[in-house]
């Protein structure tokens, strides 16, 4: 356990990665020609579990000001370039976490009202489509098929969670090898309700 006050100059948050089959930490952050700062905010953790690469991501939120949106826009391009090493790998690999983008109109309760909102901007959604076109698979959407939702994040205001007015911004994306190992995928809507405004995405793999 880390006291959040000790990290007040960075983030008052902690991240945990657990495994029943053993775990090897490969690296933290991304390193590309575009991002010489190597992810100074510590938004990526790359671990390996019984042969499967697991890249945990907390993608920047651009809603606070234009400068942060510009940082987010650069960051997602860096991420796409960096993740190329995994997408064609013969080893299973997943990108997972809070990507802060609702990809399609099915992934947000009010698409018309949020067209100018960070996380649902046209260029962000186009980036997500390009990411999938490179060979990544959205496992939850593949498993449940086309439908409205399910959502993984709700605002703390206006009883959004109770009324299910949410966004799907948390994902598990897989390369071809990892996709072939998927058994099931779901959102635990009530999961984490006490401690978070997000719900966990659970994917079961046969590894």
Q: Where are the regions that the model predicts?
A:
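Short hydrophobic/aromatic beta-strand or adjacent loop that forms the aromatic wall/cage
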Residues: 13-15, 41-46, 168-170, 197-202
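Single conserved hydrophobic/aromatic residue that forms the stacking wall/gate
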Residues: 1-7, 11
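Metal-dependent phosphoesterases centered on the DNase I-like endonuclease/exonuclease/phosphatase
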Residues: 75-169
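A well-ordered secondary-structure block
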Residues: 22-46
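Surface polyanion/phosphate-binding segment centered on an Asp-His-Pro turn
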Residues: 185-207
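Surface-exposed cleft-lining segments at the edges of enzyme active sites
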Residues: 31-35, 59-76, 112-116
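Beta-strand-turn-beta hairpins that frame and shape the catalytic cleft
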Residues: 41-58
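Conserved beta strand-loop-helix elements of the APE1-like EEP
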Residues: 12-26, 160-181
């Amino acid at each position: 356990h880390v006291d959040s006050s000790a990290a007040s100059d960075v983030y008052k948050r902690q991240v945990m990665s657990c495994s029943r089959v053993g775990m090897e930490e490969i690296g933290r952050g991304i390193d590309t020609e575009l991002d010489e700062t190597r992810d100074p905010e510590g938004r990526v953790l790359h671990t390996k579990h019984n042969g499967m690469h697991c890249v945990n991501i907390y993608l920047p939120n651009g809603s606070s000001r234009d400068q942060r949106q510009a940082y987010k826009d650069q960051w997602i391009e860096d991420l796409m370039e960096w993740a190329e090493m995994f997408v064609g790998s013969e080893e299973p690999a997943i990108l997972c976490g809070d990507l802060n983008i609702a990809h399609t109109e099915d992934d947000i309760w009010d698409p018309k009202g949020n067209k100018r909102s960070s996380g649902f901007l046209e260029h962000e959604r186009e980036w997500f489509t390009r990411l999938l076109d490179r060979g990544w698979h959205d496992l939850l959407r593949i498993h449940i098929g086309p439908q409205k939702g399910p959502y993984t994040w709700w605002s703390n205001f206006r009883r959004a969670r109770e009324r299910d007015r949410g966004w799907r911004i948390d994902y598990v994306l897989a390369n071809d090898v990892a996709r072939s190992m998927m058994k099931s995928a779901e959102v635990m809507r009530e999961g984490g309700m006490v401690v978070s405004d997000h719900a966990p995405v659970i994917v079961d793999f046969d590894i």
